[in-house]
Amino acid sequence: MKWSEISIHTTHEAVEAISNILHEAGAGGVVIEDPYDLVKDRDDWYGEIVELNPDDYPEEGVVIKAYLPVNSFLGETVEQIKQAINNLWLYDIDLGKNKITLSEVNEEEWATAWKKHYHPVKVSEKFTIVPTWETYEPASNDELIIEMDPGMAFGTGTHPTTVMCLQALEKYVHPGDNVIDVGTGSGILSIAAAMLGAHSVRALDLDPVAIDSARLNVKLNKVQHVVTVAQNNLLDHIDEQADVIVANILAEIILRFTADAYRLLKPGGRFITSGIIQAKKQDVKDGLLAAGFFIEEVNVMEDWVAFVAIKP
């Protein structure tokens, strides 16, 4: 089988949105080539187990590569991807160069092209994310291993916004808690909450691709007895109270349901949010305060912001 590699030269700000567009288009594996990875302080990420080749990275911006099967629908699929990316300006997302190129690769090249970019990553005091094909021995009995397959939608969960959410969950989820994960994507945050001892976790997403991905990952990590994956639009028609609500999605989407999050949280409950670029930081802060929240933490990693807000 032949594959077409689609390469998009863009900005840090656009990475997550474009990655989701590619996965929704049926991409088999997505690679993010970010030159910041070559120079970032590894201590910030608890020691990443990686081997990086500078020749694989652009001098500026970010290159996202994905692999699409070569078939009669390829041209139409590529045009849909281009249109969806161009529409991101409606959300004030800077696309940078927005240069899109195509090249053909064979099955063998595709099978290894993106795997070389993924290795075990320790993202917090407890959590290490491990690709399914890697053999990894925990450094201690307290280390929690989340297995992820980057071939599934939404990657391995090592994006800064995901890392900050994982770190916040580790701090604020307690045994017996009820947790709601809005816009679950791969399900990684729901899996983490379950591993931390949550009594029940609701993993919600409107995208059927995300639902399938989350269910597969939940089963892979053997937490299906705790995590319920369901298709739902944000917090619409959700009534049960939660100790923690987490959402790693665009700032504009977060602002649509801050009032619902406040309504569903128990007193003292926390709303953990990320997916927020620096330019949207004040907008989200204002929205949280207007809903009645107290801002407990504001964390920053690279160009991204995460809030921990508490319901008094």
From Swiss-Prot:
Gene3D superfamilies, A to Z: Vaccinia Virus protein VP39
Top EC class, one word: transferase
PANTHER family found in the cross-reference section: ELECTRON TRANSFER FLAVOPROTEIN BETA SUBUNIT LYSINE METHYLTRANSFERASE
Family statement drawn from the similarity comment of this UniProt entry: Belongs to the methyltransferase superfamily. PrmA family.
Predominant location: cytoplasm
Taxonomic superkingdom: Bacteria
Keywords of this entry: Cytoplasm, Methyltransferase, S-adenosyl-L-methionine, Transferase
Transmembrane domains' residue ranges: none
UniProt function note: Methylates ribosomal protein L11.
Compartments (UniProt record): Cytoplasm
Reaction equation(s) it catalyzes: L-lysyl-[protein] + 3 S-adenosyl-L-methionine = N(6),N(6),N(6)-trimethyl-L-lysyl-[protein] + 3 S-adenosyl-L-homocysteine + 3 H(+)
Gene Ontology cellular component list: cytoplasm
The organism of origin for this protein: Geobacillus thermodenitrificans (strain NG80-2)
One GO MF term attached to the UniProt entry: protein-lysine N-methyltransferase activity
Binding residues annotated for S-adenosyl-L-methionine, in chain numbering: 162, 183, 205, 248
E.C. no: 2.1.1.-
Protein name: Ribosomal protein L11 methyltransferase
GO BP term, pick one: methylation
HAMAP family: Methyltr_PrmA
